[in-house]
Swiss-Prot record:
Annotated region described as Domain I, given as residue ranges: 1-64
GO molecular function: ATP binding; four-way junction DNA binding; four-way junction helicase activity
InterPro entries the record matches: DNA_helicase_Holl-junc_RuvA_I (IPR013849), NA-bd_OB-fold (IPR012340), RuvA (IPR000085), RuvA_2-like (IPR010994), RuvA_C (IPR011114), RuvA_C_sf (IPR036267)
Record-linked Pfam families: HHH_5 (PF14520), RuvA_C (PF07499), RuvA_N (PF01330)
Membership in a protein family: Belongs to the RuvA family.
Comment field on protein domains: Has three domains with a flexible linker between the domains II and III and assumes an 'L' shape. Domain III is highly mobile and contacts RuvB.
GO process annotations (BP): DNA recombination; DNA repair
Region of interest: Flexible linker: 145-154
GO cellular component labels: cytoplasm; Holliday junction helicase complex; Holliday junction resolvase complex
CDD domains to which the protein is assigned, alphabetical: UBA_RuvA_C
Keyword Oxidoreductase part of the UniProt annotation: no
Organism: Chelativorans sp. (strain BNC1)
The name this protein goes by in its record: Holliday junction branch migration complex subunit RuvA
Organism lineage: Bacteria, Pseudomonadati, Pseudomonadota, Alphaproteobacteria, Hyphomicrobiales
Amino acid sequence: MIGKLKGVLDEIGEDHCVVDVGGVGYVAHCSARSLSTLGSVGTPVTLFIETYVREDMIRLYGFRTVLEREWFRLLQNNVQGVGAKVALSVLSTLTPSELANAIALRDIATVARAPGVGRKVAERIVTELKSKAPAFAGEAAGAIGLKQDLGEGVAPAPVSDAVSALANLGYSRDIAANAVAAALKSAGEGADTGTLIRLGLKELAR
């Protein structure tokens, strides 16, 4: 099994790249996010690989970080109806920490933004991975803490709305969720959307 490729970027396609390792070109299928970070042809590149072996083919999936590869495995191994194509679509739309945030906040709509992922599949992703997401949270510690504060239910509308509002102002969902987590601790669980946004912005201004 191939676990990592380190070589020179030889080609970038719509959903894959070719890495030249010692004169041998390896085709690795990647998320759009991974492809966008590879740089130009001819530059050194390292990919963490997930190898699929079937009777009629061997397919390599490449990831820029070990965390992204772990989420690729997690999605397929734990969520019914999610294969490699859907997993790559999710990871093309959301970073690992954004995905962990969405699961922590039970933000089904954010997960459903990925092409080919309807609400039912997004709901399964959120439900099936809610207990596993903390171990793969990456930078999403604020949202994980927020989820623990809220308990097992769906995040109240003011919380989800506040995160979305801060994200619409240009902050990443990671940063927005962390700010709302701090705001919620300060204001209490009964806080409305406006209060959470105001306190969240105050937190971001520090």
